[in-house]
């Protein structure tokens, strides 16, 4: 009677598959429908639920019919494991931080281990675990030039990483104007420029940005038509992984692409930037000369600071003006006005605006200083 009952139950469960999972010294058994095993993510969640480890990252492996321990990490090898299970699917679970990756491979389950040798062998003579090179984790990303294959040679897209470092981004930006050659003639358009680099900052240490580089995009968003404050907010919001597209002031150091197979960040295609004319005519108006009084300073110590302004004599002031004019006339044409410091942009987006007294000469049209 009992035997016939078992036979009947077995014939009625031909569509089910028994699963035996092992996590540490703990074993669990459950059943799945062989015809509808579901997806790997569902199976992964089921294993976590059965073993009561919902917040633990694990590696899942299974024993195939040849005695090999093979990984299960996607839908394809999960369905392969289900199809080869006859009649039992044996699952082995390891914590990721304690996983032995050398256990995966051919004949890994049928090899006999000499337990006595392992017990008697001193710890200093034990075999060290293999170095994992197939599943790297926590690589430190570095700043780099990206999207060389889709940008014009006159443009440069720079990715600045603050990952794992407390270095500030370390550059100042300002608004100004440049004169571009268009089919309709010379056209004066507003723009955002890098005015200064902070020694020891991320921008200077990487060497990817320079003074007077014109900022065209911030993380795939064009800065054309945006104010200096808006561009500053965009950079602050993306300071941990800042991607800036610039037109370098020194075009001789541009990266010349010789292949269409170089890496791409997938951030955005530059159909709009392809329309930018490559030749820029210098234009500088003395009455719009850059003034330290119009600087906006971003600091990370919570104390607003005003850039000190030296008062030279008339003779040295005239010579300094001539030097600035001769230097800036060889770069992209611009007419500087206001300036924002990104010397110490932090990851926090909490921004305080403090209004200064009327006797303080700082950004007269706004009367504010940005403090991080």
From Swiss-Prot:
Query: Where does it reside?
Result: Cytoplasm; Cell membrane; Cell junction, Tight junction
Query: Which residue range or ranges hold the PDZ domain?
Result: 157-250
Q: Could you tell me the keywords of this UniProt record?
A: Cell cycle, Cell division, Cell junction, Cell membrane, Cytoplasm, Membrane, Phosphoprotein, Tight junction
Q: What tissue specificity is annotated for this entry?
A: Expressed in pancreas and in both adult and fetal kidney. Weakly expressed in placenta and lung. Not expressed in other tissues.
The family database entries (SUPFAM superfamilies) matched by this protein are listed as: CAD & PB1 domains, PDZ domain-like
Ribonucleoprotein is among the record's keywords: no
Give a GO biological-process term.
Answer: cell-cell junction assembly
Q: Where is this region: Disordered?
A: 253-292
Region annotated Interaction with PARD3 and CDC42 sits at: 126-253
Skewed-composition ranges (Polar residues) = 253-272
What Pfam families does the annotation carry?
PB1 (PF00564), PDZ (PF00595)
**Which residues are recorded with the post-translational modification Phosphoserine?**
11
Q: From which residue to which does the signal peptide run?
A: none
According to the UniProt record, one GO cellular component term is: tight junction
Q: Can you give the residue ranges of the Pseudo-CRIB domain?
A: 133-150
Query: Main site of residence?
Result: cytoplasm
Q: What's the superkingdom here?
A: Eukaryota
Family stated for the protein in its record: Belongs to the PAR6 family.
Protein's job = Adapter protein involved in asymmetrical cell division and cell polarization processes. Probably involved in formation of epithelial tight junctions. Association with PARD3 may prevent the interaction of PARD3 with F11R/JAM1, thereby preventing tight junction assembly. The PARD6-PARD3 complex links GTP-bound Rho small GTPases to atypical protein kinase C proteins.
Q: What is known of its domains?
A: The pseudo-CRIB domain together with the PDZ domain is required for the interaction with Rho small GTPases. The PDZ domain mediates interaction with PALS1.
**Quaternary structure (record):** Interacts with PARD3. Interacts with GTP-bound forms of CDC42 and RAC1. Interacts with GTP-bound RHOQ/TC10. Interacts with PALS1. Interacts with the N-terminal part of PRKCI and PRKCZ. Part of a complex with PARD3, CDC42 or RAC1 and PRKCI or PRKCZ. Part of a complex with LLGL1 and PRKCI. Interacts with PARD3B. Interacts with ECT2.
Q: Which PANTHER family match?
A: PAR-6-RELATED, PARTITIONING DEFECTIVE 6 HOMOLOG BETA
Please give the name of this protein. Partitioning defective 6 homolog beta
Lineage, top ranks: Eukaryota, Metazoa, Chordata, Craniata, Vertebrata
Write the gene name.
PARD6B
């Amino acid at each position: 009677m009992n035997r016939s009952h078992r036979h009947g139950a077995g014939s009625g469960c031909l569509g089910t598959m028994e699963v035996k999972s092992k996590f540490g010294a703990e074993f669990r058994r459950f059943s799945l429908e062989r015809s509808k095993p579901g997806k790997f993510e569902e199976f992964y969640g089921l294993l976590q639920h059965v073993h009561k480890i919902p917040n633990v990252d694990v590696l899942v492996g299974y024993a195939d019919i040849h005695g090999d321990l093979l990984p299960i990490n996607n839908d394809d090898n999960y369905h392969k494991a289900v199809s080869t299970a006859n009649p039992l699917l044996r699952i082995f679970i390891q914590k990721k931080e304690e996983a032995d990756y050398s256990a995966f491979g051919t004949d890994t389950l049928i090899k006999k281990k000499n337990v006595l040798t392992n017990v008697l062998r001193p710890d200093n003579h034990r075999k060290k675990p293999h170095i994992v090179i197939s599943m790297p984790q926590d690589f430190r990303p570095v700043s780099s030039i990206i999207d060389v294959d889709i940008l014009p040679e006159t443009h440069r897209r720079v990715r600045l990483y603050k990952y794992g470092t407390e270095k500030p981004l370390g550059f100042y930006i300002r608004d100004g104007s440049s004169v571009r050659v268009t089919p309709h003639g010379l056209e004066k358009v507003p723009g955002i420029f890098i005015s200064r680099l902070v020694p020891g900052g991320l921008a200077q240490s990487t060497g990817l940005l320079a003074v007077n580089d014109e900022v065209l995009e911030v993380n795939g968003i064009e800065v054309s038509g945006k104010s200096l404050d808006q561009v500053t907010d965009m950079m602050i919001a993306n300071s941990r992984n800042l991607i800036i597209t610039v037109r370098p002031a020194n075009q001789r150091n541009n990266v010349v692409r010789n292949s269409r197979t170089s890496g791409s960040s997938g951030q955005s295609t530059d159909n709009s930037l392809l329309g930018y004319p490559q030749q820029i005519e210098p234009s500088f108006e003395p009455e719009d000369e850059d003034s330290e009084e119009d600087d906006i300073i971003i600091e990370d110590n919570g104390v607003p600071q005003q850039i000190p302004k030296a008062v030279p004599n008339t003779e040295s002031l005239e010579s300094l003006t001539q030097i600035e004019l001769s230097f800036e006339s060889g770069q992209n044409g611009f007419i500087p006005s206001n300036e924002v410091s990104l010397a110490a942009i932090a990851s926090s987006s909490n921004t305080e605006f403090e209004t200064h007294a009327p006797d303080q000469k700082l950004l007269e049209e706004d009367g504010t200083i940005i403090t991080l």
